[in-house]
Amino acid sequence: MTGDKLSNQMWGGRFAAGPAAIMEEINASIDFDQKLYRQDIEGSLSHAAMLAQTKIISHSDYEKIVHGLQLIRQEIETGSFTFSRKLEDIHMNIEARLSELIGPVAGRLHTARSRNDQVAVDFRLWVREAAQKIAQALKDLMEQLLMRAEQHADTLMPGFTHLQTAQPVTFGHYMMAYVEMFGRDLSRMRDAIERMNESPLGAAALAGTGFPIDRFMTAQALGFREPTRNSIDSVSDRDFALEFLSAGALCAMHLSRLAEEIILWSSAQFHFIRLSDAFSTGSSIMPQKRNPDAAELVRAKAGRLNAALMGLLTVMKGLPLAYSKDMQEDKEYVFDGVLNLELSLAAMMGIISDLEVNKEAMKQAAGSGYAIATDLADWCVRELGLPFREAHHITGRAVALAEQKKCSLDELSLDEFQTLHPDINAAVFDVLTIEKSVESRNSFGGTAPSEVLRQVAYWKQHLVTA
């Protein structure tokens, strides 16, 4: 049977002529939705089992349908299946092949089902599986960051605001900041999985069906928590895809921030880290170059996730209930988003696991830029009882004096300090080191090594069940 006749047979009973060539061109989605073949077959197998259980079809017909679907799955996975654009999508391609294999019995499979709920369940299954893989990749990256944080709980480096040296911190503390970000990403992904874990199968076109189906049976068979509660919403909803892309875009944004730091830190101007050969490239003209291309691509791919989210939001904006063909455009945005997020997470995992930390360069930079100025102000508050604003002013004058003399704060003499305030005494020099500065920041969540290790311990335990 030819493709155009099959296509017409599926839905064309009231049409006198076939579609125009350009209609077939714009209507076909098989080039991309063939990714859903496994989910489509799983959905059909569970639907067929339910139809047999409820005696809507005979057990004999059910066995023929199962056998045919299993053959089709084998053909697709071995590359012998021929996809036809004339048959529009993965659902009709599989149904047409099933008709060729088992004859008219194949037509019974679509009893009490529409392509509207069929594609909705296929897509939910696919997105749920993708989200679970992303969640695992996030956990793996967090574990790698935790290992780095534990190794470098006391490795000194400068902390920045406005990309200017602010206060000394530790590299471990910095890594833990990203653990927190990715922890939120993981939580959002788990929440999205929980919300999408309802089966739309059985909603039919939009109004449900008059056949005595068991939606709870198919939901359970497909691993869903329960069936969706409103048949119109079931086929209209793409929130699950949007929520996944939203969580993915946030994750990609966090990855891009870490990528930017890696790009800066690996530059000759910072020299904080060295990227491995595996995640660097060279220049076609400048032989000395080590370009952080992997990190740059991770940084850029955040734009792909943002574009996917904005694209699907725009497709769905203003659509009346229930299903509209516009919704066919949902899949490419999600497929592209998943591909680029998976690549970004895998690349960042490799970058973090392979990079070398230059402790000496970090420590030297941590002591530059008068990073311990805040410690001087805090000492004036604690030891001299000064209001913080007055202590801030005194410290600012101390920095100006040190800049004038081209020296560090701890190189100022006691006499020079006492010109700023007569009560300053020799004990002030005890706090004017980056080591003391970091050790003193032991408030909950702070940069002190003891606090960093506490944060590491918390997340190690939390990730066991996350």
From Swiss-Prot:
Q: Which Gene3D superfamilies match?
A: Fumarase/aspartase (C-terminal domain), Fumarase/aspartase (Central domain), Fumarase/aspartase (N-terminal domain)
* Lyase in keyword set: yes
Where, subcellularly, is it found? Cytoplasm
Q: Which InterPro entries would you find in this protein's record?
A: Arg_succ_lyase_C, Argininosuccinate_lyase, Fumarase/histidase_N, Fumarate_lyase_CS, Fumarate_lyase_fam, Fumarate_lyase_N, L-Aspartase-like
Asked if the keyword Amino-acid biosynthesis belongs to this entry, the reply reads yes
Molecular function, one GO term:
argininosuccinate lyase activity
Disulphide-bonded residues: none
Q: Where are the transmembrane segments?
A: none
GO terms for biological process? arginine biosynthetic process via ornithine; L-arginine biosynthetic process
Kind of enzyme, top EC level?
Answer: lyase
Listed GO cellular component terms? cytosol
- Keywords from the named record: Amino-acid biosynthesis, Arginine biosynthesis, Cytoplasm, Lyase
Instruction: Return the EC number.
Output: 4.3.2.1
Which parts form a coiled-coil structure per UniProt? none
Pathway field of the UniProt record reads: Amino-acid biosynthesis; L-arginine biosynthesis; L-arginine from L-ornithine and carbamoyl phosphate: step 3/3
Enumerate the catalysed reactions: 2-(N(omega)-L-arginino)succinate = fumarate + L-arginine
Q: Which family does it belong to?
A: Belongs to the lyase 1 family. Argininosuccinate lyase subfamily.
Report what the protein is called. Argininosuccinate lyase
Task: Name the species this protein comes from.
Answer: Bartonella bacilliformis (strain ATCC 35685 / KC583 / Herrer 020/F12,63)
